[in-house]
From Swiss-Prot:
<keyword id="KW-0204">Cytolysis</keyword>
<dbReference type="InterPro" id="IPR023347">
    <property type="entry name" value="Lysozyme_dom_sf"/>
</dbReference>
<dbReference type="InterPro" id="IPR034690">
    <property type="entry name" value="Endolysin_T4_type"/>
</dbReference>
<keyword id="KW-0081">Bacteriolytic enzyme</keyword>
<keyword id="KW-0735">Signal-anchor</keyword>
<keyword id="KW-0378">Hydrolase</keyword>
<dbReference type="InterPro" id="IPR043688">
    <property type="entry name" value="SAR_endolysin-like"/>
</dbReference>
<keyword id="KW-1043">Host membrane</keyword>
<dbReference type="GO" id="GO:0042742">
    <property type="term" value="P:defense response to bacterium"/>
</dbReference>
<keyword id="KW-0578">Host cell lysis by virus</keyword>
<feature type="active site" description="Proton donor/acceptor">
    <location>
        <position position="42"/>
    </location>
</feature>
<keyword id="KW-0472">Membrane</keyword>
<keyword id="KW-0929">Antimicrobial</keyword>
<dbReference type="GO" id="GO:0016998">
    <property type="term" value="P:cell wall macromolecule catabolic process"/>
</dbReference>
<dbReference type="GO" id="GO:0020002">
    <property type="term" value="C:host cell plasma membrane"/>
</dbReference>
<keyword id="KW-0812">Transmembrane</keyword>
<dbReference type="InterPro" id="IPR051018">
    <property type="entry name" value="Bacteriophage_GH24"/>
</dbReference>
Amino acid sequence: MANRAKLSAAVLSLILAGASAPQILDQFLDEKEGNSLTAYKDGSGIWTICRGATMVDGKPVMQGMKLTQAKCNQVNAIERNKALAWVDRNIKVPLTEPQKAGIASFCPYNIGPGKCFPSTFYKRLNAGDRHGACEAIRWWIKDGGRDCRLTKGQKNGCYGQVERRDQESALTCWEIDQ
């Protein structure tokens, strides 16, 4: 089920080397989110910094905020650890390290727990329907009401979200048929 070709060589190398979920997730998020030391507005107009953090030391990210690389590394580690802890607390089926990384990227890190808990993905996964859950990840491809599949090649498109969902699905379904 997992389409390895959708994942980067760096992520695949980590998985094949037996890397931990935090290592896999760090590489994946570096590729998907980037790491900005200066605050910027995300696609929804929310001020973010580092790998998409909206809060730093309990305070919201504001326009003009700048951080050092060391501070971003700290913020990124906190956010990564929170996402993986969420997976450990809320997913009731056994998971491999790549699966934990895929779920952490999708649910708590990207769409947020508030949207994840009522989702078909979450319900299917905890019911043991892994194939169905991996299919449901790929449904989350709208941004501001527009279908991101229709924006491929557009300057201000959101097609990267379609690719990210395919990759999160590949991680979440890593070796489920074996």
